[in-house]
C-alpha cells in the first residue's frame, strides 16, 4: 500500500510545487487587475480619457524637456528644427486692438471664443488665399481717385451715407465731402471688398475725440474671420488709424478711428464730392439694403466706441 496523504509527516511537496502555486495566484490576480484597469478606463467619460492620455504624454516627455532646459543651445536647435508651431492659437479678449498682432496673425471671432491664429497653419486663411486682389497703397490711392468711374461697385459704402444723411437731416453732399476727406475709410472698404470678406456693412459715426468720422465695419452672422493678409494690408494702408475688434449685442464689429489729430496725407489727391454726389443720383439703392442700414444704425447708436 502506498501512502497518498500529502499532510502526513515525512511527505514533502516537490521543489516546484510552491512556486507554481504562487505563480498561478499572481497571474490570476494580475489578470484580474488588468481586466479591472481596462474596464475602469473604458468606463471613463471621453474628456477624462483624453485628459488621462495627455497627462501620460506629459509625463513621458517631461524628462526630455527638463534635460533640454539645462542646455539652451540644444533647446534652440530643437525649436528651430520644428516644422509645425507648438502653439497655433492664442486666446484674446475684446476689445482687441489689431496693433497687438504680428506678421502672419489672423483673428477669429465666434461664440466659441476669440483667438489669434497663425495664417500659415489656419485652414480658413489657406482657403481664402486665392481671393485677394492687389491692394497696395498705390493701388488704393488709384481706386480712390477713380471711384467715380466704378461708383456702382461702392454702393454699400454710399448707401450708408444716404441713410445717415436722412437720419440727421444733413445735406448728403456735405457729409460725403467729410468722408472723402478721410481716404483711409475708403481704403478699408476697398481692402475688405478685395479680400474675400463676407460682405460687411459700414457705419459712419462722428469721432468725439479727434474729429472727423469713425468707421464701424459690421460683420454679418455669428462669427468673423480676419485673414492675416487683410489685417496686414489695413494696418499698412492706414498708419494713422487704430483698428479695434469688439462685439455689441452678439454682433462683431471692427472700429476704425484716428490715432490723433492728423491731417490727410498730402500724397493722396483730393476727390470732388460734388462729382460723386451727381453720379450717386443715378444709383437706385436696394430697399432691403437701406432698411438693413436703418436697423444697424439704430442698434449701434448706443455703442460706446473703444
UniProtKB/Swiss-Prot annotation:
Its main location: host cell. A zinc finger (CCCH-type) spans 106-225. Residues 1-49 are annotated as: Disordered. It comes from the Viruses. Keywords: Host membrane, Host nucleus, Membrane, Metal-binding, Phosphoprotein, Zinc, Zinc-finger. One of its GO terms (biological process) is viral budding from nuclear membrane. GO terms for cellular component: host cell nuclear inner membrane; membrane. InterPro entries: Herpes_UL31. GO terms for molecular function: zinc ion binding. It holds the Pfam family Herpes_UL31. Phosphorylated at serine residues in the N-terminus. This phosphorylation regulates the localization within the inner nuclear membrane. It is found in: Host nucleus inner membrane. Forms a heterohexameric complex with NEC2. Interacts with capsid vertex specific component 2/CVC2; this interaction directs the capsid to the host inner nuclear membrane to initiate budding. Plays an essential role in virion nuclear egress, the first step of virion release from infected cell. Within the host nucleus, NEC1 interacts with the newly formed capsid through the vertexes and directs it to the inner nuclear membrane by associating with NEC2. Induces the budding of the capsid at the inner nuclear membrane as well as its envelopment into the perinuclear space. Belongs to the herpesviridae NEC1 protein family. HAMAP family: HSV_NEC1 (MF_04023). This is Nuclear egress protein 1. It comes from Human herpesvirus 1 (strain 17) (HHV-1).
Amino acid at each position: 500500500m502506498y501512502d497518498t496523504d500529502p499532510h502526513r509527516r515525512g511527505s514533502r511537496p516537490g521543489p516546484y510545487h510552491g512556486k507554481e502555486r504562487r505563480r498561478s495566484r499572481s497571474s490570476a490576480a494580475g489578470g484580474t487587475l488588468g481586466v479591472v484597469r481596462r474596464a475602469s478606463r473604458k468606463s471613463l467619460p471621453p474628456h477624462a480619457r483624453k485628459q488621462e492620455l495627455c497627462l501620460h504624454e506629459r509625463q513621458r516627455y517631461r524628462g526630455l524637456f527638463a534635460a533640454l532646459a539645462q542646455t539652451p543651445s540644444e533647446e534652440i536647435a530643437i525649436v528651430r528644427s520644428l516644422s509645425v508651431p507648438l502653439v497655433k492659437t492664442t486666446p484674446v479678449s475684446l476689445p482687441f486692438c489689431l496693433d497687438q498682432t504680428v506678421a502672419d496673425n489672423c483673428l477669429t471671432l465666434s461664440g466659441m471664443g476669440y483667438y489669434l491664429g497663425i495664417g500659415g497653419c489656419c485652414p480658413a486663411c489657406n482657403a481664402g488665399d486665392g481671393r485677394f486682389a492687389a491692394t497696395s497703397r498705390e493701388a488704393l490711392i488709384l481706386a480712390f481717385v477713380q471711384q467715380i468711374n466704378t461708383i456702382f461697385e461702392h454702393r454699400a459704402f454710399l448707401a450708408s451715407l444716404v441713410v445717415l444723411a436722412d437720419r440727421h437731416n444733413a445735406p448728403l453732399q456735405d457729409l460725403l465731402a467729410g468722408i472723402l476727406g478721410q481716404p483711409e475709410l475708403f481704403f478699408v472698404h476697398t481692402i475688405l471688398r478685395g479680400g474675400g470678406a463676407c460682405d460687411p456693412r459700414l457705419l459712419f459715426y462722428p469721432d468725439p475725440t479727434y474729429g472727423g468720422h469713425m468707421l464701424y465695419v459690421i460683420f454679418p452672422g455669428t462669427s468673423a474671420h480676419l485673414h492675416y493678409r487683410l489685417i496686414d494690408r489695413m494696418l499698412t494702408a492706414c498708419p494713422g488709424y487704430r483698428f479695434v475688434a469688439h462685439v455689441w449685442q452678439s454682433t462683431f464689429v471692427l472700429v476704425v478711428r484716428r490715432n490723433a489729430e492728423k491731417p490727410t496725407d498730402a500724397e493722396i489727391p483730393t476727390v470732388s464730392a460734388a462729382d460723386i454726389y451727381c453720379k450717386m443720383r443715378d444709383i437706385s439703392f436696394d430697399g432691403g439694403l437701406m432698411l438693413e442700414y436703418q436697423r444697424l444704425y439704430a442698434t449701434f447708436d448706443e455703442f460706446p466706441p473703444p
